[in-house]
């Protein structure tokens, strides 16, 4: 580790460290990004990915009114649902609170998590998600996004290579917007080192 420590950001090392010693070397780092189909967003007056939560809701309302499905999410693979929910929790409660929950220092049973789950439920009730998504795999949802069926697709940045290879120049990646700026901020993301 001493030979390579300057090339490995400390933020990547948490998953390979135990009891003060390093037992692995992460080779990649991925985050959950909010991929946007800019061609579909332009149809409802958005030339940039919505930067605030209010803008995202406005954009989604306009997409639904135009008959465009805002989000695709695989319900068949629950980790995909988790990527949405964790992002909403983080943008509501903040990264520190979410990390405390993951580490067992705090409970899932708290007001911020309840608020985030309520926001997610409201998005479902407002028909922001493909109603057929519950029966789709992630690969099917990703293919639908690539075919222009959804305005947004939240998933890992490992998808960037596939989108570039397919020549999808209409795709732009951002992050889910902050919901509670007193607890969260841009740049606090779900994800981390892997491999």
Q: Model-flagged regions — what are they?
A:
Residues 1-8, 92-115, 165, 178-189:
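Short, solvent-exposed loop/beta-turn-alpha elements that line the ligand-binding surface or hinge
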Residues 1-11, 15-17, 39-51, 143-144, ...:
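Extracytoplasmic "Venus flytrap"/periplasmic binding protein-like
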Residues 51-57, 132-146:
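Short helix-initiation/N-cap motifs at beta->coil->alpha
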Residues 42-44, 126, 165-195:
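Extracytoplasmic/periplasmic substrate-recognition and gating elements
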Residues 60-62, 102-134:
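Glycine-centered hinge/linker elements that transmit conformational signals in sensory
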Residues 138, 155-160, 177:
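Beta->alpha turn/N-cap motifs
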Residues 44-48, 121-135, 149, 166-170:
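A local structural motif
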């Amino acid at each position: 580790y001493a030979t390579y420590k300057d090339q490995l950001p400390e933020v990547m090392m948490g998953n390979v460290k135990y009891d003060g010693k390093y037992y692995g070397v992460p080779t990649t780092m991925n985050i959950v990004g909010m991929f946007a189909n800019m061609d579909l967003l332009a149809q409802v007056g958005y030339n940039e990915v919505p930067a605030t939560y209010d803008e995202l809701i406005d954009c989604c309302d306009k997409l639904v009114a135009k008959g465009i499905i805002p989000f695709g999410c695989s319900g068949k693979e629950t980790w995909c649902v988790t990527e949405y929910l964790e992002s909403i929790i983080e943008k509501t409660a903040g990264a520190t609170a979410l990390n405390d929950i993951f580490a067992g220092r705090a409970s899932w049973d708290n007001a911020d998590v309840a608020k985030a789950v309520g926001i997610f439920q409201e998005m479902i009730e407002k028909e922001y998600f493909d109603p057929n998504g519950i029966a789709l795999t992630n690969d099917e949802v990703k293919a639908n996004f690539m075919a222009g069926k959804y305005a947004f697709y939240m998933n890992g940045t490992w998808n960037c290579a596939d989108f570039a290879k397919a020549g999808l120049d209409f795709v732009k990646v951002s992050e889910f917007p902050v919901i509670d700026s007193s607890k969260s901020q841009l740049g606090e993301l779900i994800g981390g080192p892997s491999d």
